[in-house]
Structures are given as structure tokens and as C-alpha cells.
């Protein structure tokens, strides 16, 4: 499908190229706008803002672009509320400084320098006190210099305190010096921690919000930012896909004009500025009317100093003019950056405005940045949820449209509800089929639709479709006649001459001005840089354009296009009748089978889940109990089913908790992260319990009525045991912290200032850092982020949230956390934080408990070496046995060939075929042993040959007949005749091997005597892929009773280097073979029976242009 205008292509690479092209075009517009502003200022002429925005050029000269970027990044000016030094590393020699250094550092009160350039070349440390020099030297020597900001320093001359904010540039280090209010370092630290605590409180508010409402999330964050900073106005700006912006949330002083709903052109926040926001995520302007201070630098430097990350960087005159026009003197802007799996995206900005000069200290700005990082994480999750909900809605609509097509193709999608208009957001839609039109909503006339179809066939005949937000830009000559009602269009070709259309009106129709009602109609000076001018300019820019088509919408259209093509195959020109009822019944049967398969798959997922899952009906009787909860409690599913959860299984301490959870869930209110206690059964002491953190979810039937409650849990018993022991010590925690016992987990403690106060022996072993190295250092930044490197900013943000929540006394959830130890090894852990209190109950910090995901024990390596030796000896024995087995097997095969000539009946022929299949199975096993086999993960040959399922089943059953008779078990089978004789392509012997292994395990663990074993083979849907036709076949092997031991199933699923039994080895390798054949194996436990489910897809035709055999790598 082709795309024009502002639309997005299907290809990710094409999308990337298109986005890059948009960014370059926007850079051109920004550069030209800036150049015109500079020219107007130099000439004294007025700057016509609206005209410059509307007539932005597509290209500018290289000189204009260079000047633009240099002006933004290397402007040579700073704001006057602080001063700046640039130094060489590591000599501290000054290579640049701001002119106001003399005033702020008190240098004029000392020896007056003979000339203003006298600071160049001197050692910057000599300007500060001895303690300040040591702090600066320590920071400069750090690998991650920014994590230590701010540094507390004092001027040597006037003893004034400063926040020193350091960052590296191409020629050295820039030191921004911001005056501090207090001269006491302790108050500085306390103020910083208090700011972080306020931020954590705000973050807790964000995290407690119900999901699915981005608007509420934005409204909450602007309220919290205003409480933290005290600005008159706080807004959330969102950047749209075409780079234009919108105010989506606002809180303001009551007498200020509202800006909520304002849209502004992309040039209002230039691309270069957006790039800077990704680098320096908090930007403060204290006073837009203040005269900027010049930066002087060493003459040897080839270009002006880079001020990209400077907290003092002066704003461009264009921006200060804009601020002054809107009555905003001071501002604080914070970037909302989303770190997706693909890239780092600037989603928008949180912007604070004040009507008088305002300075926010660095620690408070850092707390705001911390809040923004948490907001970005929460926002990203909400965006993902919104995307999933949108996709779900599209899939539901597609399902309904498909159902209509089955009954009334192709007209049901335009004559019934829902229609194609409900698939994507649009103002109108049309079906053009067999020269006729069906129109819905706001569309061109029937004649115009036909004209568009002819234009598409003539100009885009080789395309399957087209999408654009501007038909004029796409080249359609009749676009002016359509007016504003139809600006954007998406099409999908469903046959060689037939189309589906979706239409959108121009963007201005969708945009609502959020300010005073008269503003859009004001006749004032549109050339002034002002939000109203921005809005008017935006409306002019998007004139004749619709909202762009999103990727998900294009994908939905493309999916419907494919469905329509399939449904229209075979429909003649005069086909107008509904699809007959037998076909409808077939489709109902298919849907019923699909729903049944989905239900079975869900049961298997729950059963094999690695977390405890259990459920009750509305009366509190247990009706679900998976393998994990059975393992934790010692209560098997067949015993647990039918018991009362509260009376029979729950510890008395959790009776009321479960009653409340069930009561709320049965009313449709679900709870998360609730701690409960369950009893242990079996050989455990009577007082032992299992600690779980559970989520309570409502269970509903097909009518959506609530019929019970499902609990999904997480086992926290090990952590609880350590925590309980710690609590019992009542403050005397030395026994744990100082213990060398390897069973004690890694523990460290934080004081109320987020500095490390404890670091036990297990932490030393885990990180390689000894206690004396870390005590007193800040945990976020200095230790985790500096000494122990992290993978990214998000990891530090999540750790800071957890740490400050613990310090603030809030409950914390287990956090997945990772860092690099001293040797550079990456360590994966779970971490929890719990508050520390003194004897009066006052919070004095928190304890952090780490649980490693994988612990390496030195003694295991020695044991592995011994095991390797034993394996080598065993392999030699195998080699001897393999060779000795081949000789008698060849004799049996020769005798078998002789018997073939004496066969007189069909039964005898079948016996010989079964015998031959078993012989081939033995030979295949020996050959696999020769080549290393799947035990070592080497290559195993999967052959492709024609065979019938009936022969495989005969061979498999023959291998278990003797055990069946010995145990007096009855063999039941349900195999349709058409499946028995169905010719398919695959590796018959490998299939025979795995089925016989699974069936033999079923027989071994079936209760006897008078038990039974059942084998059932069920066909599924046919699939067409890469020109090959596949059929899905499911093998079910069932027996009554409690089933195979859990340890055996664990061996089968997980494998590893140590198995519980030899049977576990066999099952693991068999399931490995099934996976190599692109199949799946599940073991399902029900109340009265258990069974293996083996799902495989087989080709029903000889493979096209493929080798008859291929090598497949074992997982």
C-alpha cells in the first residue's frame, strides 16, 4: 500500500526513512525561522511570525543550517543567575569562563585582575576552599560524573556556597555554579532528600491511579509538579506524529488565560531544541528579561564551547520574545522521554510558567527530573495498554466484519452494523464494487468516488492501496472540488478493479481551542509570537490536511483487505445471494473448535505456570489448583478440589483477608498484591505456612456473569522467613548484617539521606565491594550507577523509587534489578525495601534485601568436573554397545526380509510392517547415538517421507502391549478412519519414537489392576503456508488417577544437567524432538484423569522446492 503526504508506510525501514525526512524538513523550517528573526532584529524591522511559519521553506543553505545549530548549541551566552567555568581534564586549567565569575566568586574583592582574560590558564581549584577542591577532584575522577551532581563548594574569597553542576564536553569539563541559599552542607543534603521524598509521594500517587486513563495521569502530574515548584501555570505538552504540539493538561492560577487544548506548529519548539531536551531533560529560565552573560574562552579553541548540557545556557532571543509576549517571565521545562525497545522518543514536555522571576534550586529540579522519569515509565505502560485495547477493538470489529462477509459478501460490511467505518477513525467510508458505490458518512459523491477509483487505477495500478492526509499532495487533480469535507483518504484494493475507501475531513474540524472563546476570531497582530498566533498559524498549516493515518489503522485496513480478497474469490459478477446455511454451520463448527482449542490451551498454560494459581466458586469451594500451588502446599489437586478455601486450606490469620478479597471480587472489584498465608500439608510440621502475595481476579462465564474468584500468587516464603527473623531481633540486627553464613541473603541499609549505612558480607561477595568502600556513599548514583554500573537511566529511576519509598515508610513490591559488579559481570536480582525505625518508631532509613536469580557455588564446579569424567566413561560404554547392537539387528532385518516372501494374509503383512517399523526405530536410535544425538544438542536429521498415521499407531501400540497385559490394563482408542489412512509427510520414525515414549509413561503410571489407557487422535484445521498445505493433528494419551509425579514433569519441561529419573531424561528428549518438529507437548491434570497432549502440523502434499530431508538444530 502506497502512502503520500504525512502518512506512514507499512515497512519499518520505510517508516524510519520517512521520519528522518520529516525531521530534516523540520530542521530546515526551524533554521529559516531563526534566520529571519535574527535578520529582523539586526535591521530593526518587525518579525512576522505567522507568515514565517506558514511559508516555511523545504530547504535552506548549508551555511544557514550551520549557523542555526551553532546558535542553539554553542551560543556563547549564559543566564546571569550563576557563573560558569570550563576546565581541562585532569589539570583543572581554565579554558573558558563567564564574565560574571568575578562578581559571584568575589574575585573583585581580592586582587583585581589586570585584564578580564586573566582566568584563562589558571588552576580552577585555587578559586575554592580546600574541602571544595577535594570534592571537585573526586567528582572529576569519577567515571559517571553527572551522577554525583550537585557538588557542594565554597568560594575561597567570599566563602559563598554554590551548587557545582559538572558535565563533560569535547574539550574538557563544564562547571556550572549556582548560588546556594544555605551555608550548611547538612541542610543541603537534608533539603535534597526532602525533595526526593516529596517526589516519591507524588510518584506513589501516580502509581495508585487506575490504569487506562492517560488524561488523569497527566492531570495528576501537573498538580504534583505545581505543589513541588510553586509555578503559576503547569502544562503537559504532547507532540503528535507530525511534530506539532498540543496542550493536553493544565493547572493554572485562576486569573491566567487557559491554554488547555491549544495546538501549535512544530516550529514553535524547534527540532534542535527537542534534541537538547533528550540530552538535558530539565531546562530552567529564571528571568527572560535578564541580560545574558558572555562566555570568554581560550583562543586556541577551534569553536565556541558546547553548552548543550549546561544548566545556565541562555535561551535564544526568539524564545525570550515569545515568553515576554505571553506574560511569562520564568519557566521550567521537563522532558517526557519514553524509552521503548526500539529507540528513545521525546513524547512531550511538562512546562511550568511564572509571571515573575523564579529560581528553583538544583536539588528540587533533580527531584522533578526524578518525578518525570517515573511519569515517563507510567505513561509508557499506559500507552502500551491503550495500544493493546485499540488493537483488541480493531480485532473485535474485524471478527464481526468477517462474520458479515460469511453471510453477505461483500455488502454486509457497508449495509450492517458495525460497518467498515467502525474499523478505523474516519468521517466517511465507501465500497466501490462492480462499478457501483455504497457510501457511508461524509464522502465524495458517487461520481467523485468513481473518478478517484479511475485515478488510482491509472496512476497507481501496481499498488494494492494508498493512504494520504492530503489528496492534493498525493496528486489527485479533483482534490480542490472536494473542499474541506474530504482531505485525507485511505484505500484498499480488494479485486483488480474494486476498492474500499475511508475518508477524513481536514484537521481543523477536530481541533478545539481551549482558551477564551473570542481568541480564535481576534483580529489582533497575527505576526506577534503568542499562543494565539501559534494556534492560528497551526490552523493555516494544516489547512486541507486531515489527521495522519496511524500504523495500527493502516495495518487494520490491510488485514481487512486480505480477508476481503479471500472472501471474494469465486464470487462471480452476478453473485448476490447469501451464503448457504450448511456453510454457515461449517463456519460455526470451525469457530466452536477454535474456542475449544483456546480453552484447552488456557488450561494448559495455567497448569504448567511457574506461579501458584488457584480458584474458588461463588460459595468458596476450590475449583482450580495448579501444579505450583500443589507443590508449595503439599496438597495435590485431586485432594484440594472441593475443599473450602478459607476453612480447610487458609491459615487462621488470613481468614478475614480472604473473605474480604472474595467478597470484593464477587462484586467485580479486584485487588492486587495482598499478602496471605496458606497451610502446608503432608510431612510438614503443623505450624508451617506458605506466604503468598496474590492478585484476586473475577471469574466469569460465557454470559459475563461472575461465577467465582481466581487467585494468581507469588511465593514470598523465603523472604518472609528472613524478615520474620529480622523483626524478632527487635533492632539488634548485627547477627544478620555481620553473619558470614552463606544462607543469609545480600542485605544493605540506607539512612534517611539515601546514604549506605550497612553492607553485609553477602553484599561484599555479590558486588566485590567491601563495606568500608561504600559506607557513607549515596546509594543511587555513587554506589549503584557509579561503583556498580547500571544498564540505563530507567534502572536507576526504578531503584530510586523503591529506595525512597522504603525511606518514606511506604510498602514496596519486589523489583527486578540488575547491575554490574566490580569485575564487570552483570548481576540479576530481586530487591525489596523495608523501613528502619528506632526505638520510638521514627523512620531512620530502610533495609534492602536482595534475592539473586542464579547463585553460583564453587563446589558445583568441582562436582561438574567429576560428572564430566563419569560421562566420558559412559560414552565409551555407549560406543561399544552401539557397535554390538548393530550386528544382531542386521540379522533380524535379514530374517525379516526372508519372511516377507512367505506372507499369505493381510494380518501377517500388517504384523511384518509393524515389526519393520520397530526395527527402523531401533536403528534410528543407534544412528542418533553415533552422531552425538539430541542429548548433547547436536544436529539430528529429520527426514521427510510419505507415511500414514495408522502404521505409526500400530507400531506405537505394539511397544506397550506387554506392559499393558502385565498390569491388566485396558487399551481404549479413538482414531477416525480417515486419519488412519491419511497420507502425510514427515519423519515417521521420529514421530513413532516420541509417541511410544509418552504412551509408555502413561502405561507405567496408570493405576492397576482394572485400570485403562486411552489414545485419541484428532484432526484440526488445514493451513496454507509458503505454498504448502499443513494439517494439524493432536494426539491425546490419557489415564485415570493422580498422574505422573511432578518431578517427572519438571524434568520433561525444564531439563538441565541433572534429572530426577531416567524416565525424566527420556521424556525431556522426546519433548525436545517434538519441538524440533515444530510441535508442542503439554501434560494436563484433571480431577479424575491426566493426559499428554501432543500437537503437530504435517504436510499433506509433497513439499515444494524443498529438500526431502533437512538438518534441524536442537534447542
Swiss-Prot record:
One of its GO terms (biological process) is red, far-red light phototransduction. Residues 672-728 form the PAC domain. One of its GO terms (molecular function) is protein homodimerization activity. It comes from the Eukaryota. Keywords: Chromophore, Photoreceptor protein, Receptor, Repeat, Sensory transduction, Transcription, Transcription regulation. Pfam families: GAF, HATPase_c, HisKA, PAS, PAS_2, PHY. SMART domains: GAF, HATPase_c, HisKA, PAS. Contains one covalently linked phytochromobilin chromophore. Phytochromobilin binds at residue 318. SUPFAM superfamilies: ATPase domain of HSP90 chaperone/DNA topoisomerase II/histidine kinase, GAF domain-like, PYP-like sensor domain (PAS domain). Residues 880-1100 form the Histidine kinase domain. Residues 213-383 form the GAF domain. InterPro entries: GAF, GAF-like_dom_sf, HATPase_C_sf, His_kinase_dom, HisK_dim/P_dom, PAS, PAS-assoc_C, PAS-like_dom_sf. Residues 598-669, 732-803 form the PAS domain. Homodimer. Belongs to the phytochrome family. Regulatory photoreceptor which exists in two forms that are reversibly interconvertible by light: the Pr form that absorbs maximally in the red region of the spectrum and the Pfr form that absorbs maximally in the far-red region. Photoconversion of Pr to Pfr induces an array of morphogenic responses, whereas reconversion of Pfr to Pr cancels the induction of those responses. Pfr controls the expression of a number of nuclear genes including those encoding the small subunit of ribulose-bisphosphate carboxylase, chlorophyll A/B binding protein, protochlorophyllide reductase, rRNA, etc. NCBIfam families: sensory_box. This is Phytochrome E.
Amino acid at each position: 500500500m502506497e502512502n503520500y503526504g504525512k502518512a506512514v508506510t507499512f515497512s519499518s525501514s520505510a517508516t524510519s526513512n520517512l521520519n528522518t525526512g520529516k525531521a530534516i524538513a523540520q530542521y530546515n523550517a526551524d533554521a529559516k525561522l531563526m534566520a529571519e528573526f535574527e535578520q529582523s532584529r539586526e535591521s530593526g524591522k518587525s518579525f512576522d511570525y505567522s507568515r514565517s511559519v506558514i511559508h516555511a521553506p523545504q530547504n535552506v543553505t548549508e551555511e544557514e543550517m550551520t549557523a542555526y545549530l551553532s546558535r542553539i548549541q554553542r551560543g556563547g551566552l549564559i543566564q546571569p543567575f550563576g557563573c560558569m567555568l570550563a576546565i581541562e581534564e585532569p589539570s583543572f586549567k581554565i579554558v573558558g569562563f563567564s564574565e560574571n565569575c568575578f562578581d559571584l566568586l568575589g574575585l573583585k574583592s581580592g586582587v583585581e585582575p589586570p585584564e578580564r582574560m586573566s582566568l584563562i590558564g589558571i588552576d580552577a581549584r585555587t578559586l575554592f576552599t580546600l574541602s571544595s577542591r577535594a570534592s571537585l577532584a573526586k567528582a572529576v575522577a569519577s567515571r559517571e560524573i553527572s551522577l554525583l551532581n550537585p557538588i557542594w563548594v565554597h568560594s575561597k574569597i567570599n566563602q559563598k556556597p554554590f551548587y557545582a553542576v559538572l558535565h563533560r564536553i569535547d574539550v574538557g569539563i563544564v562547571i556550572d555554579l549556582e548560588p546556594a541559599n544555605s551555608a550548611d552542607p547538612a541542610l543541603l543534603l537534608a533539603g535534597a532528600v526532602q525533595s526526593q521524598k516529596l517526589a516519591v509521594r507524588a510518584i506513589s500517587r501516580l502509581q495508585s491511579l487506575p490504569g487506562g486513563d492517560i488524561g488523569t495521569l497527566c492531570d495528576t502530574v501537573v498538580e504534583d509538579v505545581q505543589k513541588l515548584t510553586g509555578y503559576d501555570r503547569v502544562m503537559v505538552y504532547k507532540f503528535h506524529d507530525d511534530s506539532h504540539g498540543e496542550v493536553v493538561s493544565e493547572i493554572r492560577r485562576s486569573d491566567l488565560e487557559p491554554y488547555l487544548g491549544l495546538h501549535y506548529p512544530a516550529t514553535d519548539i524547534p527540532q534542535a531544541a527537542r534534541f537538547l531536551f533528550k540530552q538535558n531533560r530539565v531546562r530552567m529560565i529564571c528571568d527572560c528579561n535578564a541580560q545574558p552573560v558572555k562566555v570568554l574562552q581560550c583562543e586556541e579553541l577551534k569553536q565556541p564551547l558546547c553548552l548543550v548540557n549546561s544548566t545556565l545556557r541562555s535561551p535564544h532571543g526568539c524564545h525570550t520574545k515569545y515568553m515576554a509576549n505571553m506574560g511569562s517571565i520564568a519557566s521550567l521545562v521537563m522532558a517526557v522521554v519514553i524509552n521503548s525497545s526500539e529507540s528513545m522518543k521525546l513524547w512531550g514536555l511538562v512546562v511550568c510558567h511564572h509571571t515573575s522571576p523564579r529560581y528553583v534550586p538544583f536539588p528540587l529540579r533533580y527531584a522533578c527530573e526524578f518525578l518525570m522519569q517515573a511519569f515517563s515509565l507510567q505513561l509508557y505502560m499506559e500507552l502500551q495498554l491503550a495500544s493493546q485495547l485499540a488493537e483488541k477493538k480493531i480485532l473485535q470489529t474485524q471478527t464481526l466484519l468477517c462474520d458479515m462477509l460469511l453471510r453477505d459478501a461483500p455488502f454486509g460490511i457497508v449495509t450492517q452494523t458495525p460497518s467498515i467505518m467502525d474499523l478505523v477513525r474516519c468521517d466517511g467510508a465507501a465500497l466501490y464494487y462492480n462499478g457501483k458505490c455504497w457510501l457511508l458518512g461524509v464522502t465524495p459523491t458517487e461520481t467523485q468516488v468513481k473518478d478517484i477509483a479511475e485515478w488510482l487505477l491509472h496512476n497507481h495500478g501496481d499498488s494494492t492501496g494508498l493512504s494520504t492526509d492530503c489528496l492534493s499532495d498525493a496528486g489527485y487533480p479533483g482534490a480542490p472540488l472536494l473542499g474541506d469535507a474530504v482531505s485525507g483518504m485511505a484505500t484498499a484494493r480488494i479485486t483488480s478493479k474494486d476498492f474500499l475507501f475511508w475518508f477524513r475531513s481536514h484537521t481543523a474540524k477536530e481541533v478545539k481551542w481551549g482558551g477564551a472563546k473570542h481568541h480564535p476570531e481576534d483580529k489582533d497582530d497575527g505576526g506577534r509570537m503568542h499562543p494565539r498566533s501559534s494556534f492560528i498559524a497551526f490552523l493555516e498549516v494544516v489547512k486541507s490536511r486531515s489527521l495522519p493515518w496511524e500504523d495500527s489503522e493502516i495495518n487494520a485496513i490491510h488485514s481487512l483487505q486480505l480477508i476481503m480478497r479471500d472472501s471474494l474469490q469465486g464470487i462471480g459478477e452476478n453473485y448476490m445471494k447469501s451464503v448457504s446455511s450448511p456453510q454457515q454451520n461449517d463456519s460455526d463448527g470451525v469457530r466452536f473448535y477454535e474456542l475449544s482449542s483456546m480453552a484447552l490451551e488456557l488450561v494448559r498454560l495455567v497448569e504448567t505456570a511457574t506461579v501458584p494459581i488457584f480458584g474458588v466458586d461463588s460459595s468458596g469451594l476450590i475449583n482450580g489448583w495448579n501444579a505450583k500451588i500443589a507443590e508449595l502446599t503439599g496438597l495435590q489437586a485431586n485432594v484440594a478440589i472441593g475443599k473450602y478455601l478459607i476453612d480447610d486450606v487458609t491459615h487462621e490469620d488470613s481468614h478475614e483477608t480472604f473473605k474480604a478479597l472474595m467478597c470484593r471480587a464477587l462484586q467485580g472489584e479486584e485487588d492486587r498484591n495482598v499478602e496471605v498465608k496458606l497451610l502446608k500439608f503432608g510431612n510438614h510440621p503443623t505450624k508451617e505456612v506458605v506466604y503468598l502475595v496474590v492478585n484476586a481476579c473475577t471469574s466469569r462465564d460465557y454470559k459475563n456473569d461472575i461465577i467465582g474468584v481466581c487467585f494468581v500468587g507469588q511465593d514470598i516464603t523465603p523472604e518472609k522467613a528472613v524478615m520474620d527473623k529480622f523483626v524478632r531481633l527487635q533492632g539488634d540486627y548485627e547477627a544478620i548484617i555481620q553473619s558470614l553464613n552463606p544462607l543469609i541473603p545480600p542485605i544493605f541499609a540506607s539512612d534517611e539521606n539515601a546514604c549506605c549505612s550497612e553492607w553485609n558480607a553477602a553484599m561484599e561477595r555479590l558486588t566485590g565491594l567491601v563495606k568500608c568502600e561504600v559506607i557513607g556513599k549515596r546509594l543511587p548514583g555513587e554506589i549503584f550507577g557509579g561503583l556498580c554500573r547500571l544498564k540505563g537511566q530507567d534502572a536507576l529511576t526504578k531503584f530510586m523509587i523503591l529506595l525512597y519509598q522504603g525511606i518514606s515508610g511506604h510498602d514496596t513490591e519486589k523489583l527486578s534489578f540488575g547491575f554490574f559488579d566490580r569485575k564487570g559481570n552483570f548481576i540479576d536480582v530481586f530487591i525489596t525495601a523495608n523501613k528502619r525505625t528506632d526505638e520510638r518508631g521514627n523512620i531512620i532509613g530502610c533495609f534492602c534485601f536482595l534475592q539473586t536469580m542464579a547463585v553460583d557455588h564453587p563446589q558445583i564446579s568441582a562436582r561438574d568436573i567429576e560428572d564430566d569424567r563419569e560421562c566420558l566413561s559412559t560414552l565409551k560404554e555407549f560406543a561399544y554397545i552401539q557397535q554390538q547392537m548393530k550386528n544382531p539387528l542386521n540379522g533380524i532385518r535379514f530374517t525379516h526380509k526372508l519372511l516377507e516372501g512367505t506372507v499369505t494374509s493381510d494380518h501377517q503383512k500388517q504384523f511384518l510392517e509393524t515389526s519393520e517399523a520397530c526395527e527402523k526405530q531401533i536403528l534410528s536410535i543407534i544412528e542418533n547415538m553415533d552422531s552425538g544425538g539430541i542429548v548433547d544438542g547436536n544436529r539430528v536429521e529429520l527426514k521427510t517421507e510419505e507415511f500414514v498415521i495408522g502404521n505409526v499407531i500400530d507400531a506405537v501400540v505394539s511397544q506397550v502391549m506387554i506392559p499393558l497385559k502385565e498390569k491388566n490394563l485396558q487399551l481404549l482408542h479413538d482414531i477416525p478412519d480417515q486419519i488412519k489412512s491419511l497420507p502425510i509427510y514427515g519423519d515417521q520414525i521420529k514421530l513413532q519414537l516420541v509417541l511410544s515414549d509418552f504412551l509408555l509413561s502413561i502405561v507405567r503410571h496408570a493405576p492397576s489392576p482394572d485400570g485403562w489407557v486411552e489414545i485419541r487422535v484428532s484432526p484440526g484445521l488445514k493451513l496454507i503456508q509458503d505454498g504448502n498445505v499443513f494439517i494439524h493433528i493432536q494426539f491425546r494419551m490419557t489415564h485415570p488417577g493422580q498422574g505422573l509425579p511432578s518431578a517427572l514433569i519438571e524434568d520433561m519441561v525444564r531439563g538441565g544437567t541433572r534429572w530426577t529419573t531416567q524416565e525424566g531424561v527420556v521424556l525431556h528428549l522426546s519433548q525436545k524432538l517434538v519441538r524440533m518438529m515444530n510441535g508442542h507437548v503439554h501434560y494436563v491434570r484433571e480431577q479424575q484423569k491426566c493426559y499428554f497432549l501432543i500437537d503437530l502440523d504435517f504436510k499433506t502434499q509433497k513439499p515444494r522446492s524443498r529438500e526431502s530431508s533437512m538438518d534441524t538444530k536442537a534447542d
